[in-house]
């Protein structure tokens, strides 16, 4: 068994083999001073107290006390890898972004896959959307396409995002996952129906990270060299084929190998089985957007492929594992506002909210100079601006260059060629209620036409199996929403709930009771 282990299990062995005949490095403190003894503290006598002058101990312990940084408030559990994006089809008619400059061009990328609601130690095989974030290191700075494995989302207004995430996480008193919180929010916000239906379908538990699609999800804007703009959506189609886990296999793996997705990705790359995805775009003109039957910037809906076909762009290939997880994955920070010329945001309310929220949380989690961390640094562009100082400034702080603008001393100048595309909007300023913007039509299509009968059966079973743990009044609200999609959808879920609710609670947990030992009182006293 020990001779037939996978690359992830043998990482330490491989690291030693790579060093070959090299002698071990000299052990040092953080300050580089050689350490004479790493096994024993400096004390007064063998039983005496420690000394403050034991700098080997204080150096080690002080750093250990500060090892952990705040985990991501969402997408805490993840896996990362590196590779390249190669253009295979010309889309310069749509975008002047250098990443799409010519066929055959390669751009380095970093990718992070993740679950959403779980903590950093949670299982990879839970039913949860998957994050699918890609950082393109371009000559015009980083482009971060921060998406999921679904083309839609639970809400369409960013103001609801904190409450939505709170509902998916732990109860503030019990610190337990709470089905009442989850389903109460979903049932009160029927715009979640599309994503909830996707989540509880077979695709709700992907088989690792390699066998799922990715989506930019939001609507973006592409601008070409002539200043002409279109709206677009980004799609990554897995070249490995879609594979999903059954409920039973997912539960088994959550127990036996909670890091299943991370392990699978690492081993695939380590053995040269490089995963890849094909990038496509959908394109919509501004005039088409004006007459579109629904809001084209609504994140709870998709653009029909029959009307807006997928246009191939290129291929993403992952061919390198992280050298160190903390340095290259835990500190990896994606920001939707990182957009080079040729790619811009649309009026999508969720995207607009993320433009602020993502860099803001990175400054909290990693510090104001998080863009100087090597994995986040736009190393293919020359950063020149008027930002200075701050905690953990690791570069030369831009030397003696002026730190104010405008100035008369040959410091960085803005470039009119990088100006955003001019767009006209008009309308009243108010808080518009979008809760009832047709929450059912596309869900009905998904239920009746995308899924077959066996998939519909599993969808209803999965929903009922989770919804049964919520209070009855919440169950009724949720079933009404599913019935609004299609009467059969709601009735099938209700029938399954009725069966669950008729069953008496059973204690399926088997325990071992500790009986009295045969030790004498004297023997117990010596324990």
Curated annotation (Swiss-Prot):
Modified residues (Phosphothreonine): 511
A UniProt-annotated Pfam family: Catalase
GO molecular function, a single term: catalase activity
Positions annotated to bind heme: 358
UniProt GO cellular component terms: catalase complex; cytoplasm; mitochondrion; peroxisomal matrix; peroxisome
Motif Microbody targeting signal per record, residues: 524-527
Modified residues (Phosphoserine): 9, 417, 434, 517
Co-factor requirement: heme; NADP(+)
Location within or outside the cell: Peroxisome matrix
Residue positions, PTM N6-acetyllysine: 233, 449, 480, 499
Bias-annotated ranges (Basic and acidic residues): 1-22
List of residues that carry N-acetylalanine: 2
GO biological process: cellular detoxification of hydrogen peroxide; hydrogen peroxide catabolic process; positive regulation of cell division; response to hydrogen peroxide
Residues that hold NADP(+) according to the record: 194, 198, 201, 203, 213, 215, 237, 303, 305, 442, 445-446
UniProt subunit comment: Homotetramer. Interacts (via microbody targeting signal) with PEX5, monomeric form interacts with PEX5, leading to its translocation into peroxisomes.
Role played: Catalyzes the degradation of hydrogen peroxide (H(2)O(2)) generated by peroxisomal oxidases to water and oxygen, thereby protecting cells from the toxic effects of hydrogen peroxide. Promotes growth of cells including T-cells, B-cells, myeloid leukemia cells, melanoma cells, mastocytoma cells and normal and transformed fibroblast cells.
Similarity-based family: Belongs to the catalase family.
Protein name: Catalase
């Amino acid at each position: 068994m020990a001779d037939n282990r996978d690359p992830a299990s043998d990482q330490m062995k491989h690291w030693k083999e790579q060093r070959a005949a090299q002698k071990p490095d000299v052990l040092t403190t953080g300050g580089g001073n050689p350490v004479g003894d790493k096994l024993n503290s400096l004390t007064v006598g063998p039983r005496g107290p420690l000394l403050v002058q034991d700098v080997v101990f204080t150096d080690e312990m002080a750093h250990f006390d500060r090892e952990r940084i705040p985990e991501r408030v969402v997408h805490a559990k993840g896996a990362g890898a590196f590779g390249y994006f190669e253009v295979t089809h010309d889309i310069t008619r749509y975008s002047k972004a250098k990443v799409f400059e010519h066929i055959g061009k390669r751009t380095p990328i970093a990718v992070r896959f993740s679950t959403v609601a779980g903590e950093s130690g949670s299982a990879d095989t839970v039913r949860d959307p998957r994050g699918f974030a890609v950082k393109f290191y371009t000559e015009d700075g980083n482009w971060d396409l921060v998406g999921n494995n679904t083309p839609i989302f639970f809400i369409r207004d960013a103001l609801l995002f904190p409450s939505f995430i709170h509902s998916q996480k732990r109860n503030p008193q019990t610190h337990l996952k709470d089905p009442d919180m989850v389903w109460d929010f979903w049932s009160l916000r029927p715009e979640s129906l599309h994503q909830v239906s996707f989540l509880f379908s077979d695709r709700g538990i992907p088989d690792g990270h390699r066998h799922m699609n990715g989506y930019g999800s939001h609507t973006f804007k592409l601008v070409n060299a002539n200043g002409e703009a279109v709206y677009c959506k980004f799609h990554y189609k897995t070249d490995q084929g879609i594979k999903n886990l059954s409920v039973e296999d997912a539960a088994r793996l959550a127990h036996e190998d909670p890091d299943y997705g991370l392990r699978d990705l690492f081993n695939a790359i380590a053995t040269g089985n490089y995963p890849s995805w094909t990038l496509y775009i959908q394109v919509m003109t501004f005039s088409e957007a004006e007459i579109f039957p629904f809001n084209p910037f609504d994140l709870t809906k998709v653009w029909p492929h029959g009307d807006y076909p997928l246009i191939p762009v290129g291929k993403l290939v992952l061919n390198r594992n992280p050298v160190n997880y903390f340095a290259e994955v835990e500190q990896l920070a994606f920001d939707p506002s990182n957009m080079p010329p040729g790619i811009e945001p649309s009026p999508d309310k969720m995207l607009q909210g993320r433009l602020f929220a993502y860099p803001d949380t990175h400054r909290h989690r990693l510090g104001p100079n998080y863009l100087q961390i090597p994995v986040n640094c736009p190393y293919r562009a020359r950063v020149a601006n008027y930002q200075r100082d701050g905690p953990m400034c690791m570069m030369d702080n831009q030397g003696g260059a002026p730190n104010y603008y405008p100035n008369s001393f040959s410091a960085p100048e803005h470039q009119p060629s990088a100006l955003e595309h001019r767009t006209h909007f008009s309308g009243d300023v108010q808080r518009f209620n979008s809760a009832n913007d047709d929450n059912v039509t596309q869900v009905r299509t998904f239920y009746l036409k995308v899924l077959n009968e066996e998939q519909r059966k599993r969808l209803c079973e999965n929903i009922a199996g989770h919804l049964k743990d919520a209070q009855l009044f919440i169950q009724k609200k949720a079933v009404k929403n599913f019935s609004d999609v299609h009467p059969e959808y709601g009735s099938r879920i209700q029938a399954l709930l009725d069966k669950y609710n008729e069953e008496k609670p059973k204690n399926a947990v088997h325990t071992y009771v500790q009986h009295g030992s045969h030790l004498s009182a004297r023997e117990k006293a010596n324990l």
